[in-house]
Amino acid sequence: MASLKVPATVPLPEEDAEQLYKAFKGWGTNERMIISILAHRNATQRSFIRAVYAANYNKDLLKELDRELSGDFERAVMLWTFEPAERDAYLAKESTKMFTKNNWVLVEIACTRSALELFNAKQAYQARYKTSLEEDVAYHTSGDIRKLLVPLVSTFRYDGDEVNMTLARSEAKILHEKIKEKAYADDDLIRILTTRSKAQISATLNHYKNNFGTSMSKYLKEDSENEYIQLLKAVIKCLTYPEKYFEKVLRQAINKLGTDEWGLTRVVTTRAEFDMERIKEEYIRRNSVPLDRAIAKDTHGDYEDILLALLGHDHA
């Protein structure tokens, strides 16, 4: 599942903190040292390193990284060094700003995280920005997009595997009726997608395909130029096949005229500890090229090195 490679024997946080402190000293920053430590520690270990660094050197490690690094490499290291909830809060805030607005990031956070992970992200958001995520999403969106996104970020889904098949059949019928009527922002359609567990939604969509001959997403393709419809399709993909969703984000980031470093960095840093191996499998299945080779072709230097390290590349 995770692509992150952590050594069997990990140095004490005090040792890692000392090595990082030394990496910032002298005439030039030792980027290789930073990568060799941070890109091979899990979230708990990175959190301990930050705490020890603050205690021993009276400095914030994130501020040190921000001061010493630059460009895409800095962004990747910073995002990776955040705690997961803290990182999601930052990404969500960036996605609501005028010049970095990205509703797809909100869908990613709401639909690919567990209920507890989303809850923790919202707590981190309140602590960091002194406002709620729901409040900001409602303020920065409008119309059908607001109608979809606010309940998405507000929900606390059941995370278990138990499924009500009778409910799945009845709600598949409801969804089909709404799609057939092109009532894409219908209250019941939004209620089902924003409140049901991922297992329940998968069962419902399976009934939809079996009973009506094609998937719900295929029906939505007719109006795929509409941003709301695109978001609706992203919600379905993130809830049911997140690896396919993230593969597409990576493919588009790499294949664009000029790499979309923001999309590339976001996916690698948020999925390396979770399901990046599945995403890599989906990428090679879809593109016939390994993800690490595609990234190596489109990036360079320290930025390339940290991305490859997080992908579990043997030489990074």
UniProtKB/Swiss-Prot annotation:
Expressed in flowers. The modification Phosphothreonine is found at T100, T112. InterPro entries: Annexin (IPR001464), Annexin_repeat (IPR018502), Annexin_repeat_CS (IPR018252), Annexin_sf (IPR037104), AnnexinD_plant (IPR009118). Annexin repeats lie at residues 11-82, 83-154, 166-237, 241-312. SMART domains: ANX. The modification Phosphoserine is found at S95, S288. Ca(2+) 3 binds at T299, E304. Induction: Up-regulated by cold, heat shock and salt stresses. The keyword Cytoplasm does not apply. Keywords: Acetylation, Annexin, Calcium, Calcium/phospholipid-binding, Metal-binding, Phosphoprotein, Repeat. The modification N-acetylalanine is found at A2. Ca(2+) 1 binds at F24, G26, G28, E68. The modification Phosphotyrosine is found at Y129, Y283. Gene3D superfamilies: Annexin. It comes from the Eukaryota. GO terms for molecular function: calcium ion binding; calcium-dependent phospholipid binding. Ca(2+) 2 binds at I254, G258, D298. Pfam families: Annexin (PF00191). GO terms for biological process: response to cold; response to heat; response to salt stress; response to water deprivation. A pair of annexin repeats may form one binding site for calcium and phospholipid. Belongs to the annexin (TC 1.A.31.1) family. This is Annexin D7.
